[in-house]
């Protein structure tokens, strides 16, 4: 019975992973500066997607939820650009397991 239960759990997780990622990532700004642009692109992409903040800003100390629907995987590159034009990039992040907290240590 234990082997059957383990197989069922593994099957569920493998099926979910194969179906892709359908969720979100929370991005927190702890840089000390307001973030004016936020880009989230698939890790294998050669270019950045559109700014997900649109006309909004992400003030220092605040968090925004970015919806990621129908993604082929949960591995993303995430870049923020602050009020001074400085960029912060996190590469190859598994957003199914980790949210993002940008700090000055992430500055490019």
Residue locations for each model-derived region?
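Sec-dependent signal peptide recognition
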Residues: 1-7
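N-terminal signal peptide c-region/cleavage motif recognized by signal peptidases
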Residues: 12-15
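Structural beta-strand segments of beta-rich domains
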Residues: 21-25, 64
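Asparagine-centered strand-capping/turn motif at beta-strand->loop junctions
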Residues: 25-32
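Short acidic/proline- and small/hydrophobic-mixed sequence motifs that coincide with surface turns
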Residues: 33-37, 88
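Intrinsically disordered, low-complexity Pro/Gly/Ser/Thr-rich segments with frequent PxxP/GP/PP motifs
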Residues: 46-72
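A short, solvent-exposed beta-strand micro-motif common in secreted/extracellular proteins
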Residues: 73-83
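Extracellular beta-sheet/turn segments enriched in Thr/Pro/Gly and aliphatic residues
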Residues: 87-108
């Amino acid at each position: 019975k234990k082997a059957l239960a383990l197989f069922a759990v593994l099957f569920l997780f493998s099926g979910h992973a194969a179906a892709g990622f359908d969720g979100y990532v929370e991005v927190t700004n702890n840089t000390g500066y307001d973030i004016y642009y936020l880009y989230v692109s698939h890790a294998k992409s050669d270019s950045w997607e559109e700014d997900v903040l649109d006309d909004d800003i992400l003030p220092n100390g605040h968090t925004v939820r970015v919806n990621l629907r129908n993604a082929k995987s949960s591995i993303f590159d995430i870049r923020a650009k602050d009020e001074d034009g400085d960029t912060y990039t996190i590469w190859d992040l598994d957003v199914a397991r980790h949210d993002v907290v940008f700090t000055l240590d992430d500055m490019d």
